[in-house]
Swiss-Prot record:
It comes from the Bacteria. SUPFAM superfamilies: F1F0 ATP synthase subunit C (SSF81333). The keyword Mitochondrion does not apply. F-type ATPases have 2 components, F(1) - the catalytic core - and F(0) - the membrane proton channel. F(1) has five subunits: alpha(3), beta(3), gamma(1), delta(1), epsilon(1). F(0) has four main subunits: a(1), b(1), b'(1) and c(10-14). The alpha and beta chains form an alternating ring which encloses part of the gamma chain. F(1) is attached to F(0) by a central stalk formed by the gamma and epsilon chains, while a peripheral stalk is formed by the delta, b and b' chains. The chain crosses the membrane at residues 7-27, 57-77. InterPro entries: ATP_synth_csu_bac/chlpt, ATP_synth_F0_csu, ATP_synth_F0_csu_DDCD_BS, ATP_synth_F0_csu_sf, ATPase_proteolipid_c-like_dom, F/V-ATP_Csub_sf. One of its GO terms (cellular component) is proton-transporting two-sector ATPase complex, proton-transporting domain. The record marks 61 as: Reversibly protonated during proton transport. The gene is atpE. Its main location: membrane. This is ATP synthase subunit c. Keywords: ATP synthesis, CF(0), Hydrogen ion transport, Ion transport, Lipid-binding, Membrane, Thylakoid, Transmembrane, Transmembrane helix, Transport. GO terms for molecular function: lipid binding; proton-transporting ATP synthase activity, rotational mechanism. Pfam families: ATP-synt_C.
Amino acid sequence: MDPLVSAASVLAAALAVGLAAIGPGIGQGNAAGQAVEGIARQPEAEGKIRGTLLLSLAFMEALTIYGLVVALVLLFANPFA
């Protein structure tokens, strides 16, 4: 494999994981903070808030996993080689 393609693939994989983690990380922090605030305001709605929070956290985490999959494809099954 060409060393330039190999180096570009490693950099692209690093960017894929890094950028894919920034958005969901910020979103998960905001969602958890708002959920805690909502539970503090209405303790009787805790079950509904928690269920909605966990579902939304799972969807946000899926974006990070997609970035990891792209990085693994670039590193081990490089389509540009």
